[in-house]
Amino acid sequence: MARDTQGTQGTQSQASNIWTQVESQPMEKIVWGRLYGKNIKIKSLGTSSKYRIIYTHSSFSVDLNNDEFTAGRGEANDLILTLNDLPEKILTRISKVHFIIKRANCELTNPVYIQDLSRNGTFVNNEKIGTNRMRILKNDDVISLSHPTYKAFVFKDLSPNESIGLPEEINKTYYVNRKLGSGAYGLVRLVYDTRTCQQFAMKIVKKNMLSGARPSTNFSDPDRVLNEAKIMKNLSHPCVVRMHDIVDKPDSVYMVLEFMRGGDLLNRIISNKLLSEDISKLYFYQMCHAVKYLHDRGITHRDLKPDNVLLETNDEETLLKVSDFGLSKFVQKDSVMRTLCGTPLYVAPEVLITGGREAYTKKVDIWSLGVVLFTCLSGTLPFSDEYGTPAAQQIKKGRFAYGHPSWKSVSQRAKLLINQMLIVDPERRPSIDDVLQSSWLRDAPMLQKAKRLMKLDGMEIEEENFLEPPTKRSRR
């Protein structure tokens, strides 16, 4: 038995030593990019030996496998440029550190940046970056030094190509990054403007997905699509997601929109279970201003729900923006109603009653706002198939209740406003101006916060929109 024990211990000790040796060996770094010499031979690497030379036919190349790669005349650079590499007339115009190429954490999902630190210029595809400025490098970009005609390097991005199949107009302007989300009509990707490095969300909408089984003459008409896109692009309000760019193709529409880092309102509600009355009020007030802006311009959203409300930051007090307000204009009416009838939880009763076959007014947005406010305050829906009768029947009759325990701490004024917005008869439902003048929103501290947040966008909002109307002392 003693021998067995010793044998076991010896095996464990041997395995431990092997594991220690493996741990002590440096892990091979991921090569995320490569620089090929174009009119330059890459010979003079820095003494740190972080990079290895690979000879390829008539030129040299260097693998990029660290967070940063520097090039210039200085001896501390990863690539030291000397007379062996460049003609003297060019070398004299090279700075000690001419440029830096970097990719955060060497992650293939992160974009590659090039920063110009030179006095005489670093150029990408003949365009000057500018001292201390950055731009994004893409596969096959050509880097020139001191003058656009001196093409020194070609950059190769070794990460997966996410831009395959996208229009040339998109690939020329944007670096296409990871998927942010997807839905019935297409997907959303994170993109970067290569010149400004600004982030955007690019929504790719497939036209054949929108038009349904039957051909949609409205949607397939390029002039109609482009006209609606122009309307969306001209909208400018702090609480409405801006369209930065639009590319219309026969099979798809590519909409480049503001990127909101705080996610959507639905996830914010889910992660908190519900929102406090103060935060609900701050968010709701901003939503109302967005809807007022749209209604004043003859635009009805038609699909207001927490999924379509985006938050600028992860902070509790943050700017809020309504999105997807123009999508319904692209969609054939019958197709829209088939979609809405599948999940009618935020849809006004008049839409369900008529099946979308009759005209309806802006009051459909007021109903949806009421449902959104109900959800914010309680973390529950006013209408659901789980409540016994089908949700569509509950909506048509306007039957809902404040049964959740969270309603005990909600003010009567908030409930009164919800009651008014969820009136089945649209003629009796308040307008967006009426909602904004409701007693519940006469809250000076909230109005000041909203004013501060809504001006972050650099837009002037009329002062009277934020003034508390004269009223008697409010009661809860």
Swiss-Prot record:
Reactions catalysed according to its record: L-seryl-[protein] + ATP = O-phospho-L-seryl-[protein] + ADP + H(+); L-threonyl-[protein] + ATP = O-phospho-L-threonyl-[protein] + ADP + H(+)
UniProt main location, coarse: nucleus
Keywords: ATP-binding, Kinase, Nucleotide-binding, Nucleus, Serine/threonine-protein kinase, Transferase
Protein name: Ovarian-specific serine/threonine-protein kinase Lok
Residue ranges annotated for the Protein kinase domain, each copy included: 174-441
Active site, UniProt feature: D303
EC number(s) from the headed UniProt entry: 2.7.11.1
Residues annotated to bind ATP: L180, G181, S182, G183, A184, Y185, G186, L187, V188, K203
Subcellular location: Nucleus speckle
Family indicated by similarity: Belongs to the protein kinase superfamily. CAMK Ser/Thr protein kinase family. CDS1 subfamily.
Domain FHA: 69-129
An annotated Gene Ontology molecular function: protein kinase activity
Disulfide bond annotation, renumbered to this chain: none
Class of enzymatic activity (EC top level): transferase
Gene deletion effect: Does not affect male germline stem cells maintenance. In the germline, RNAi-mediated knockdown of Rtel1 in lok mutant background results in partial rescue of single Rtel1 knockdown phenotype which includes loss of germline stem cell and reduced levels of Stat92E expression.
Cellular component GO terms held in the UniProt record: cytoplasm; nuclear speck; nucleus
GO biological process: apoptotic process; cellular response to gamma radiation; cellular response to X-ray; DNA damage checkpoint signaling; DNA damage response; ectopic germ cell programmed cell death; germ cell development; intrinsic apoptotic signaling pathway by p53 class mediator
Free-text tissue specificity from the UniProt record: In stage 3 embryos, both isoforms are expressed in both somatic and pole cell nuclei. Expression in pole cell nuclei is sustained until stage 9 and weakly expressed after pole cell invagination into the abdominal cavity.
Species in which this protein is naturally found: Drosophila melanogaster (Fruit fly)
CDD domains: FHA_CHK2, STKc_Chk2
